[in-house]
């Protein structure tokens, strides 16, 4: 993929194999343990990380026996503890679309943004329903209110810029 100028993304972490619910419409609840997840669904992600996949996209699924409160996309347990710490992923984490029912119907946008930045999601997928200027303003307001720090945001910026440098998509002198 790199030779063709494409940045590969493994998705949807930690796997959609245990649900038939379409996350565009609702939030699936998956009843499995962490050990079961590591023994099956996480295997392709472990292999992708070992092969140095540059990015991983989250899945909007709630694993109620692992994190009963938040879906993977918003979960410290999955994003920080499992993906970053236990699996050792240092690349770019991409959210799945935030307009999808699994997120938009259950969580407010400001709360979603706080969790995304706090728990190391680097690229946030937003499309038709949001204006980027409004999102930037909202992030600035969250920083001013003390709900986010500039470092929360800049961690992702640094990872995205490192990925762009790795693929020759940014002039290092311009930074």
Q: Where do the language-model regions lie?
A:
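Second-shell residues forming the walls of enzyme active-site clefts
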Residues: 1-152
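Cofactor-pocket helix-loop regions in the catalytic cores of large enzyme subunits
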Residues: 175
């Amino acid at each position: 993929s790199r030779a063709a100028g494409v940045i590969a993304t493994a998705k949807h972490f930690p796997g959609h194999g245990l649900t038939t619910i379409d996350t565009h419409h609702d939030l699936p609840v998956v009843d499995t343990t962490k050990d079961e997840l590591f023994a099956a669904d996480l295997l392709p992600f472990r292999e992708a990380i070992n092969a140095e996949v540059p990015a991983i996209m989250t899945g909007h699924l709630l694993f109620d026996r692992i994190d009963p409160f938040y879906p993977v996309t918003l979960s410290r347990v999955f994003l920080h503890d499992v993906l970053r710490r236990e699996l050792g992923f240092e690349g770019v984490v991409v959210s799945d679309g935030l307009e999808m029912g699994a997120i938009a119907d259950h969580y407010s946008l400001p709360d979603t943004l706080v969790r995304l930045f706090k728990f190391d999601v680097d690229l946030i997928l937003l499309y038709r329903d949001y204006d980027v200027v409004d999102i930037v303003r909202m992030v600035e307001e969250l920083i001013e209110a003390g709900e986010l720090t500039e470092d929360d945001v800049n961690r992702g910026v640094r990872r995205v810029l490192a990925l762009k440098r790795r693929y020759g998509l940014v002039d290092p002198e311009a930074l």
